[in-house]
């Protein structure tokens, strides 16, 4: 390269003009700018807190996904052990949720199964028939459009969803982990962030063992336990003791 | 540039101090207008939209003065690209200008420019004789004072491409200016003769 062209003396007048102090005209817009600044002050706190909460939501989602992936690892082993140890007839519950979505292969399906079964297996079974499979997409879509999740989580339909996810604060992550059949999963929280991360580690565990169970077997075992997993807890309905924390 | 005071001014503006915000605005708006004038029109509107976005995001912004400038000009460029799209849509030529380029170049004009007392508007008009990328990069590097990597991120090109564009842009401008100078002194000489 030759000498820096910026040192060319021919440029000096041009650069001087480009960097010249403000002309009167260029400061005309100050009043309008200050007005919009003032207006932004009024509405400012909500945006910033929303941003903060979004960050937490994203962090929560990431954490949830991580837990799900961990649960897959551990749960996969546990399930295999469980399956081989016990008679299939007596323990249909473990597989029920898994077999509900045998068509939708893939890591996230496995992860989803695990999040529900990885927890206390009894609780998770209660949810299987409702919140897995095709219904999950609808539920997730609906969930993503609900403003007040605290209240919504107590609606019967969402109770199953939150139970499957392991808590209303984990629904976004859970939904994000759904296979994108209808593309509904992306409608939730941070679209770009979620799907990328975890699933790679997942697929090792499951698919082979899954199809044994029949979804039809499930319901009998279900009603014994309440699927209410809302963190806010409805003391009236159910004590939150069965809360699937995702700890296997 | 605000310099040393910047951090204090910014934090005061962030908490709603109008005087502090006015200082930030006065410092940057002229440069912003000159940059946005590369599109040839509607610089004032786009600048106002830019500030509208900036004040909304101000409470969340963190960074030093260079980061601040990079942020404001990144915002400005987005608004300018939007405005450019609207223009082409209005011109019923939606298939054109897919690159996201918003700078409109101009042909050399024959206006007599007194080079030693160029206005900033005339200077921007000279810059607009460059190819769009060169014009934009020259202004962001030389006038706004952003680093190569900041400009690269802002315009969506590689740092290498930005370096080359800045270098060629300045070379071209030097050529334009020296030719302009010759023309002017010639015509001045002619005027003296007649």
Model segments located where?
Chain B
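Internal acidic/polar
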Residues: 2-6, 90-120, 147, 190
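A short, charge-rich alpha-helical start-of-domain segment used by transcription regulators
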Residues: 3, 10-34, 41, 135
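Sigma70-family region 2
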Residues: 11-15, 38, 49-68, 86-90
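Short, small-hydrophobic-rich alpha-helical interface motif
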Residues: 13, 32, 36, 43-54, ...
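Amphipathic alpha-helical segment used for protein-protein interaction
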Residues: 15, 104-139, 144-154
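Short helix-capping/turn signature of helix-turn-helix
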Residues: 27-30, 38-39, 139-147
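Arg/Lys-rich amphipathic alpha helix in sigma70-family domain 2
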Residues: 38, 59-63, 73-98, 116, ...
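DNA-recognition helix of helix-turn-helix
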Residues: 77, 81, 134, 143, ...
């Amino acid at each position: 390269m030759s000498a820096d062209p910026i040192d060319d003396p021919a440029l000096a007048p041009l650069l001087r003009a480009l960097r010249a102090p403000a002309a009167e005209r260029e400061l005309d817009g100050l009043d309008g700018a200050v007005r919009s600044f003032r207006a932004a002050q009024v509405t400012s706190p909500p945006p910033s807190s929303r941003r903060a909460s979004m960050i937490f939501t994203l962090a929560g989602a990431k954490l949830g996904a991580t837990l799900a992936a961990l649960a897959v690892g551990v749960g996969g082993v546990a399930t295999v052990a469980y399956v081989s140890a016990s008679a299939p007839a007596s323990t249909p519950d473990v597989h029920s949720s898994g077999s509900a979505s045998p068509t939708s292969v893939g890591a996230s399906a496995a992860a989803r199964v695990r999040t529900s079964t990885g927890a206390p297996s009894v609780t998770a079974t209660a949810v299987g028939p409702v919140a897995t499979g095709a219904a999950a997409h609808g539920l997730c879509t609906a969930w993503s459009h609900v403003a007040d999740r605290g209240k919504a989580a107590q609606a019967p339909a969402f109770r199953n969803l939150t139970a499957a996810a392991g808590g209303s604060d984990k629904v976004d992550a859970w939904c994000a982990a759904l296979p994108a059949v209808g593309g509904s999963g992306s409608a939730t929280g941070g679209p770009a962030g979620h799907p990328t991360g975890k699933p790679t580690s997942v697929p090792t565990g499951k698919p082979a063992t899954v199809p044994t169970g029949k979804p039809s077997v499930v319901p009998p075992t279900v009603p014994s336990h309440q699927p209410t997993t809302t963190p806010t807890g409805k003391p009236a309905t159910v004590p939150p003791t069965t809360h699937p924390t995702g700890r296997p | 540039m605000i310099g040393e005071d910047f951090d204090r001014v910014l934090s005061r503006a962030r908490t709603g101090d109008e005087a502090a915000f006015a200082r930030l605005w006065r410092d940057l708006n002229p440069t912003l207008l000159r940059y946005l004038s590369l599109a040839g029109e509607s610089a004032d509107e786009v600048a106002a939209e830019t500030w509208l976005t900036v004040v909304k995001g101000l409470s969340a912004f963190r960074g030093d003065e260079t980061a601040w400038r990079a942020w404001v000009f990144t915002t400005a460029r987005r608004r300018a690209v939007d405005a450019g799209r609207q223009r082409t849509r209005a011109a019923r030529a939606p298939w054109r200008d897919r690159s996201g380029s918003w700078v409109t170049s101009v042909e050399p004009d024959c206006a007599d420019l007194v080079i030693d007392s160029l206005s900033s508007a005339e200077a921007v008009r000279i810059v607009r004789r460059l190819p769009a990328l060169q014009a934009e990069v020259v202004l962001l590097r030389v006038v706004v004072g952003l680093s190569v990597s900041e400009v690269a991120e802002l315009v969506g090109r590689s740092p290498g491409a930005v370096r080359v564009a800045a270098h060629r842009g300045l070379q071209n401008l030097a050529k334009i200016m020296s030719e302009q100078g010759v023309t002017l002194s010639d015509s001045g000489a002619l005027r003296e003769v007649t």
